[in-house]
Amino acid sequence: MKGPFRRLALAVPFLLTLTLNVSAETVAETARAWGLIGPWSLDCSVAPDRGEGAVLAYQIASGDRVVHRRNFGATIDESEVIAAKVSGDGMLNLRVFFPKLKQTREYGFAMQPDGTMRALYNRNQKGEYTIRNGKFTANGNPTPSQHKCN
């Protein structure tokens, strides 16, 4: 082999190795690297409640699992993040099992330049969307930014 073909032959196995390593990351590693771990809210100064004060936290649990805790003030629930992958455009795609709802949902977050994140889609396993293209399907309003709380 000569010239560009030789370089290509050397580059392909290297690129395949990189691809395999990326896909071998755990849910916890992916969530941590993307910046998801921690509490998020529309307004971190408001106490948890059903309206503007819901706190959505993503935490690393035993066994290197990621749990999604929703604090609505009067009620708190916990669900397991069963898959996390980052798309080529930087979107974090999650699959979460909600035991109280008895359903698995898939949703995607985009990290904004100011460090907030927005939900770009949210759907059930039947492909029924509550959020599509960054807008609520019920009213067409854009999803709000969520702030990371300390």
Model-derived features with residue positions:
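Bacterial N-terminal signal peptides
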Residues: A9-T19
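Beta-sheet ligand-binding and adhesion/scaffold domains
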Residues: T26-T30, P48, M91-N150
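N-terminal glycine/threonine-rich, aromatic-flanked beta-hairpin/loop signature
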Residues: V46-M91, P142-T143
